[in-house]
Amino acid sequence: MKRTIVTLAVVFMALTVSAQEWAPVGDNIKTSWAESLDPSAPLPEYPRPQMVRSAWMNLNGLWNYAVTEASSESFVPEGKILVPFALESSLSGVGRRFTRDNALWYEREFTVPRSWKGKNVILHFGAVDWMAEVYVNNVLIGEHKGGYDPFSFDVTPALKKSGKQTLKVKVQDATDNSFQPRGKQCIINAGIWYTPVTGIWQTVWMEPVSSAYVKNYYAVSDIDKGEIAFEVDARTADGDVVK
């Protein structure tokens, strides 16, 4: 009974801390989903329903953040941001504008489950607008350009054998001051132009895989023949791509 009471107390304290560190910004009209948002577990749904693996970890939630000069290679956290909501949005808890002269930094810690030992760990981003540099334990894992497509990295080589791991993401977004695809986003939004979307705006998550695994698949149907052809994108133990 004592153990149960202590556990419930810890959970309650964690939820209280989350509520104190985050609140929607501004007086924007909210949907029922926004009204009931839990900052300790935003968007908890499995992010890839067409190819489900039972083991995975959702990294959404409160991260440290800072806005620095674009050329900066380091940062000092200035507050909390709720991932996966864009910097400019109310639900991020920040509601701040961004320019091409800025860099947006994210930081959080995570622990790899013991049950993942011997597996490769894949880090997934549903979308980050626009250019992202990803670091694990201060090791640059990879870069991605594009605000609308998902991307992933095998972070296994950068992981420590045990204990807390550190994940950092540096984002730059020029919006309409560059060539990048942006829809109707505009830094000076008025009329038909929308407020920009900067930073992580889709689920961040990890999963363990074997050294050889299926990364993706594509299905093409032939109605006349009554057939479906599958193209499988796989990775071998040697790192080769097989299709």
Predicted regions and their residues:
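Sec-dependent signal peptide recognition
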Residues: 2-8
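N-terminal pre-domain segments of enzymes
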Residues: 20-56
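Predominantly extracellular/luminal regions of secreted and cell-surface proteins
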Residues: 61-84
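Accessory beta-strand-rich segments of carbohydrate-active enzymes
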Residues: 64-68, 96-97, 101-216, 237
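Beta-strand acidic-aromatic groove motif in beta-rich domains, primarily in extracellular
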Residues: 72-75, 180, 241-243
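Beta-strand-rich binding/interaction modules
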Residues: 136, 226-243
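Short, solvent-exposed loop/linker segments at the N-terminal edge
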Residues: 220-226
